[in-house]
Amino acid sequence: GGGSGGHITPLLPLARALKSKDPTCQLIYIGLRGEKIAVAQSFQSVFNKTARINSGKFRRYHGESWLSHLLDVKTLVLNFLDMFKVIAGSFQAYRLLGKYKPAVIFSKGGFVVVPVGMAARLRRIPIVTHDSDAAAGLANRIVGRWASLHATGMPPRYYPYAKDTIIQTGIPVDEHIKPVNTGLQAQLKRQIGLPPDGLMLLVT
């Protein structure tokens, strides 16, 4: 997982489903050093172990010209320094994978998966990626070149991977999240002062 909930929270329902099918399976979460979410009780109750490694990210700002990128000295310096974090994280991940000897690596994306993917490649551990968005993230595109299988939230045509390696699985959703019918939608809209037949757009 990465440093945001978008990469991490889908891991919980997946982990619970795996535990339900095989209570003896051992699940290890490798996250970014310094993140707070993995210490939550919800994580501690489903993962057998949690570990943290260093990693760096490649900062890029869509819509800017190449000249703007070249003149953005601060970003260039930060990207250069973060390369060393990726290298350090790769050594840390290599040691962790040697210690725990996992059967498979599941990559949900986020820049922390790059060192783990590199270490898994060196240790010849199979990798499975999952992309929730219609566009694969940079980290999964990097790790994806070594992956055996790509699970996706959207149809295969949206992804750059070999088509025979893609399975559209949808997005893991917590079992406590239930579908909402139109009647309940109308009721909830009235509660917050919206017309029951009005269109509501949620931006997160």
Descriptions of predicted regions:
Residues G1-S4, K19-D82, T169-P172:
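Conserved nucleotide-sugar phosphate-binding/catalytic loop shared by glycosyltransferases and other
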Residues P195-T204:
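Conserved donor-binding/catalytic core segment of Leloir-type glycosyltransferases
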Residues G1-I8, I105-S107:
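Short, glycine-rich nucleotide/cofactor-binding loops
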Residues H7-K19:
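Short amphipathic alpha-helix
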Residues E64-V104, L122:
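An amphipathic, basic-hydrophobic alpha-helix
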Residues K19, Q44-V46, F91-F106, V113-V128, ...:
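Glycosyltransferases and closely related glycan-assembly transferases
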Residues C25-I28, G34, R121-G183, L194:
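Active-site-proximal region of nucleotide-activated glycan assembly enzymes
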